[in-house]
From Swiss-Prot:
It is an enzyme of class 6 (ligase). InterPro entries: aa-tRNA-synth_II, aa-tRNA-synth_II/BPL/LPL, Anticodon-bd, Anticodon-bd_dom_sf, His-tRNA-ligase, HisRS-like_core, HisRS/HisZ, HisRS_anticodon. PANTHER family: HISTIDINE--TRNA LIGASE, MITOCHONDRIAL-RELATED, HISTIDYL-TRNA SYNTHETASE. The gene is hisS. This is Histidine--tRNA ligase. Its main location: cytoplasm. One of its GO terms (molecular function) is histidine-tRNA ligase activity. Homodimer. Its EC number is 6.1.1.21. Keywords: Aminoacyl-tRNA synthetase, ATP-binding, Cytoplasm, Ligase, Nucleotide-binding, Protein biosynthesis. It catalyses: tRNA(His) + L-histidine + ATP = L-histidyl-tRNA(His) + AMP + diphosphate + H(+). GO terms for cellular component: cytoplasm. GO terms for biological process: histidyl-tRNA aminoacylation. Gene3D superfamilies: Anticodon-binding domain (3.40.50.800), Bira Bifunctional Protein, Domain 2 (3.30.930.10).
Amino acid sequence: MSKSLQAIRGMNDILPEQTPVWRYFEGTVSRLLDNYGYKQIRMPIVEFTELFKRSIGEVTDIVEKEMYTFEDRNGDSLTLRPEGTAACVRAVLEHGITGGGQVQKLWYIGPMFRHERPQKGRYRQFHQIGLEVFNLDGPDIDAELIIMTWRLWGELGIRDAVKLELNSLGTSESRGRYREALVEYLSAHHDKLDEDSQRRLKTNPLRVLDTKNADTQAVLVDAPKMADYLDDESRAHFKGLKARLDAVGIPYVLNPKLVRGLDYYSKTVFEWVTDKLGAQGTVCAGGRYDGLVEQMGGKPTPGVGFAMGIERLVLLLETLEQIPEEISRQVDVYLCAFGEEAELAGLALAERVRDQLPNLRLQVNAGAGSFKSQFKKADKSGALYALILGDDEMAQQVVGFKPLRGQGEQQSIAWDALAAHLATCVVQG
């Protein structure tokens, strides 16, 4: 027997009853970014594998274990993008839009791919909204990114459920000095480290800091602290960022073990975390990557950005029951018409109403049916009101207006007055 066709493990369909919440979230974010002056960019989901090896780092978990990589018919090694920053940097370099010190404030949205073990809040195809800013090197733009997310959490009603964690990784030089001290300390406690941390000690020592292993965490209690190795420039930058967050009133926690999983970060790194989603608690993360553009073949160009996970934030909205009631309702008004003449008149009437009320969600019954069956579909649609058009209404050139979600008697509304009536009852209120 042939195997039934189904989605690949960890790559999920987003069904019609789920998409309203996604659209609400995405719309809220895009309006906010427009208001802050960010412009959207769209990149391919497939890139040359070398792009991610050069940017993310060949000894990171993403490149070593998690990328979907394949060879195309030309023999080129291609990869489904595991994150968006590298692709965005490639795009701005290829098209020269950061040349001459041009400031670019960009955002993107789309699917990313990592071959991880699927669990709640973590998938092999997942969706992110990301921001990248180029040619601004001060702490003011770092603060703006965090302030924007703080405002977003407020608009979504989840501000009390998330916490901001901050750290500074310094410059590559100061980070190198810290890495030497950390390696020396961890090497002296090598036998107490878990197997994965022993491997990371050889390949990417800073990643030992974000271990989840309790024994290794105990070893790290007395490990050297990144803050003690920061250069003066990074120290001043971090102080400036904290001062701006304090001025706006955004609370934060300093986390000296916060390093992020990608090699290109420098100076500021941050994460927004929640304890409402179990182990997958990071909902938004980012930081500064001043050396990445040069590393990828461009001129020295400061950069900073972040990405937020849509699946996790949608799950958080659902967990906290912070989804506006009207978001779940996809239909405002359902028009029932009985008889061929009424169907034709109803179709024309619906289009006239749509001309006057373009934001009204009006569904016209399709497939005819009895009075009972059409009303059943109207109720199932979630509409607030049903419009009724039968022989009596046709004769009087009126439409029956019946509330479906509360008290109220059916009324007869003249065709010419219908749009104004709907504007009062539905659009305005």
